[in-house]
Amino acid sequence: MKIAVITFPGSNCDSDIYRVLKDQYNAEVDRIWHRDGLDKKYELVILPGGFSYGDYLRSGAMAGFSPVMKSVKEHVDKGGKLFGICNGFQILTEAEYLPGALIRNKTLKYICKTVILTKGSAGNPVTASMDVRKELKIPIAHADGCYYATSDVLKQLEDEDRILFRYSGENPNGSLDSIAGITSKNFKIVGMMPHPERAMNPITGEMDGKVVLDLILGS
């Protein structure tokens, strides 16, 4: 699989996802600087975590206007897959690839901890192979991770099976309906706040990130 990992000024998780894809999936991965375009056809483009453009204005707000996003739009228009992790999810909502917004955590504090995720919508094809009873331990690290949307959008996400994951038990950031990740209507654009790339090695304590990335890469 050919994958592009976009690096914006302030990205700090691009190396993590790049190494995971290279070392554990043997994928063909290119790192793309935000001023450059996608000079080849990729099956998947990843917007990594971090603090793109220093989170000025709002988290992810400025990255949507970065030069590389023109190529990302062309990639999406041709049916390519797009995956945003944490700040990448914020970028996807700011650029209106996904509905809703990621706002300040209910605690008004930065949160860095491992949370429990469960399957969201039963009919979402991305997580179709995941047992509805399975719980995943995945880290979060954000200050603006509270998913917010209007009641109409929340109903649409439910009706269209577009909720990828929910927080189970504790809702760490106050996300409406405990939403931790969602997909586009065609399920080719995926955004989530937790970091699967940080749960890929027993040295760090968790391995459930592999379950998540297997689902994303296999969908």
UniProtKB/Swiss-Prot annotation:
<dbReference type="InterPro" id="IPR010075">
    <property type="entry name" value="PRibForGlyAmidine_synth_PurQ"/>
</dbReference>
<keyword id="KW-0547">Nucleotide-binding</keyword>
<keyword id="KW-0378">Hydrolase</keyword>
<keyword id="KW-0436">Ligase</keyword>
<keyword id="KW-0067">ATP-binding</keyword>
<comment type="subunit">
    <text>Part of the FGAM synthase complex composed of 1 PurL, 1 PurQ and 2 PurS subunits.</text>
</comment>
<comment type="function">
    <text>Part of the phosphoribosylformylglycinamidine synthase complex involved in the purines biosynthetic pathway. Catalyzes the ATP-dependent conversion of formylglycinamide ribonucleotide (FGAR) and glutamine to yield formylglycinamidine ribonucleotide (FGAM) and glutamate. The FGAM synthase complex is composed of three subunits. PurQ produces an ammonia molecule by converting glutamine to glutamate. PurL transfers the ammonia molecule to FGAR to form FGAM in an ATP-dependent manner.</text>
</comment>
<comment type="pathway">
    <text>Purine metabolism; IMP biosynthesis via de novo pathway; 5-amino-1-(5-phospho-D-ribosyl)imidazole from N(2)-formyl-N(1)-(5-phospho-D-ribosyl)glycinamide: step 1/2.</text>
</comment>
<keyword id="KW-0315">Glutamine amidotransferase</keyword>
<protein>
    <recommendedName>
        <fullName>Phosphoribosylformylglycinamidine synthase subunit PurQ</fullName>
        <ecNumber>6.3.5.3</ecNumber>
        <ecNumber>3.5.1.2</ecNumber>
    </recommendedName>
</protein>
<keyword id="KW-0963">Cytoplasm</keyword>
<dbReference type="GO" id="GO:0005524">
    <property type="term" value="F:ATP binding"/>
</dbReference>
<dbReference type="GO" id="GO:0004359">
    <property type="term" value="F:glutaminase activity"/>
</dbReference>
<feature type="active site">
    <location>
        <position position="195"/>
    </location>
</feature>
<dbReference type="GO" id="GO:0004642">
    <property type="term" value="F:phosphoribosylformylglycinamidine synthase activity"/>
</dbReference>
<feature type="domain" description="Glutamine amidotransferase type-1">
    <location>
        <begin position="2"/>
        <end position="219"/>
    </location>
</feature>
<dbReference type="GO" id="GO:0006189">
    <property type="term" value="P:'de novo' IMP biosynthetic process"/>
</dbReference>
<feature type="active site">
    <location>
        <position position="197"/>
    </location>
</feature>
<dbReference type="Pfam" id="PF13507">
    <property type="entry name" value="GATase_5"/>
</dbReference>
<dbReference type="InterPro" id="IPR029062">
    <property type="entry name" value="Class_I_gatase-like"/>
</dbReference>
<keyword id="KW-0658">Purine biosynthesis</keyword>
<feature type="active site" description="Nucleophile">
    <location>
        <position position="86"/>
    </location>
</feature>
<dbReference type="GO" id="GO:0005737">
    <property type="term" value="C:cytoplasm"/>
</dbReference>
